[in-house]
A protein has these predicted regions:
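Alpha-helix initiation/capping motif
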Residues: 131, 142, 180, 184-185, ...
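Thiamine diphosphate
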Residues: 1-21, 184-224
Length: 224
């Protein structure tokens, strides 16, 4: 997020009509640097659009366990205008995104766009503690699920074309030869050892003491 603010500042200093977009999750609101960036973006009037994907979970922790208050209120506290949309109404989402981008371009000031959505699969492979009923309810609500259930020629055609493309990709991957490496090796050959030095048996001592002795011996050998 701070890097995005820096890019937005660079765009402002060059009098560009472009804007910088940074995408974060609801779990990112636990990071203090987010609020420092919102403050700077508001104070310096940076062309920054912060898009927050609110999928209710920070990895596997529901935001009700960690998030206090309202999400948009956090940006509004810095005087940043906020917009709310969701992925279940795509036409409305597209319209709000376009309006928000135009608002940032026109004013040069930051905006905060919250998009409510849901992650249908686990964050990782084995950390899904959500109830099966909750996940199932969102699968049933998902746009692709609803589209696939439509008894229409268009849905059937899209389904058939998708399956054909996946099958063709699998065949192509299986038939593809192993790619040749671009370079023989990514590691340089090691330098030959000039000589071996037999050392005295080690002592049981603290690492910091050994470091001090090594530094002292080197300083005694080298007057610099």
């Amino acid at each position: 997020v701070p890097v995005a603010a820096g890019l937005a500042l660079a765009l402002k200093l060059t009098n560009s009509d472009r804007l910088c977009v940074v995408v974060i999750g609801d779990g990112t609101l636990g990071e203090g640097v987010v609020y420092e960036t919102l403050n700077i973006a508001a104070k310096w009037e940076l062309p920054l659009l912060v898009v927050l994907e609110n999928n209710l979970y920070a990895q596997s922790t529901h935001h009700s366990q960690t998030l206090g208050g309202d999400i948009c209120a956090r940006a509004e506290a810095f005087g940043i205008e906020t917009v709310t949309a969701d992925t279940w109404d795509p036409m409305s989402l597209i319209g709000k995104v376009q309006e928000t981008v135009q608002a940032v371009r026109g004013s040069g000031r930051p905006r905060f766009l919250r998009i409510d959505t849901y992650r249908l699969n686990a964050h990782s492979k084995g950390d899904d503690d959500r109830s099966a009923a909750e996940v199932r309810s969102y699968w049933e609500r998902d746009l692709l699920t609803r589209f696939a259930q439509e008894d229409s020629p268009l849905a059937s055609r899209f389904q058939r074309e998708a399956e054909e493309r996946v099958a063709a990709a699998v065949v192509k991957a299986r038939e593809a030869a192993e790619p040749e490496p671009l370079i023989p090796s990514a590691q340089a050959p090691s330098a030959p050892c000039r000589r071996w030095i037999r050392t005295e048996p080690g002592q049981n001592r603290r690492v910091v003491s050994a470091i001090q002795d090594a530094l002292r011996r080197n300083m005694e050998r080298d007057a610099r």
